[in-house]
Amino acid sequence: MEIRYIDQSDDLIEISNIYESSWKYAYKGIIPQDYLDSIPTGRWASGIDKFRMNNLVMIENGHIIGTASISKSRWQQYSDYGEIISIYFLPAYMGKGYGKHLLKKCIEELNIRGYDKILLWVLEDNQRARAFYEKNGFSCSKNYMNSNIGGKELREVMYFIE
């Protein structure tokens, strides 16, 4: 198993496919199905390319199986925090212990950048993700934000570790 930053040799469509597959699997029953079904191939590729320095990949047996995005907090009131923007895996690799390794690497990389406090946002109804972050030391805050995804109003909750 290897975790590293994305480089020029990586196939951005392959990495985008991890986002797409993960969304369709993890958000089933949370985000409207017609929206999930309409996600086009490569939807995330341009964003991944734009922010290459902030994207990690996890490789197992020569294949990219997971990806994560990190940065300084995007929220002014948390300007001294690092942020884990996303962690996604191909569905076949979910629930097998890979996530804790990628999460640990995200935390390490943000610590190297000088962030001892880290936040992330999770869909309130995504119980699997919430349990994962809580098991790995993150605390649920009382901070929420509303999002509209696929025409459905959803609420995200902020988690943090200090």
Predicted regions and their residues:
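Extreme N-terminal starter segment of soluble prokaryotic enzymes
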Residues: 1-3
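Acetyl-CoA-dependent GNAT
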Residues: 5-9, 16, 20-92, 103-105, ...
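Short helix-adjacent coil turns
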Residues: 10-11, 97
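Glycine-centered flexibility sites
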Residues: 66, 82, 95-99, 137, ...
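C-terminal "cap" of GNAT-fold acetyltransferases
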Residues: 82, 116-119, 123-130, 134-136, ...
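Conserved glycine-rich acetyl-CoA-binding loop
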Residues: 86-104, 111-113, 124-131, 135-136
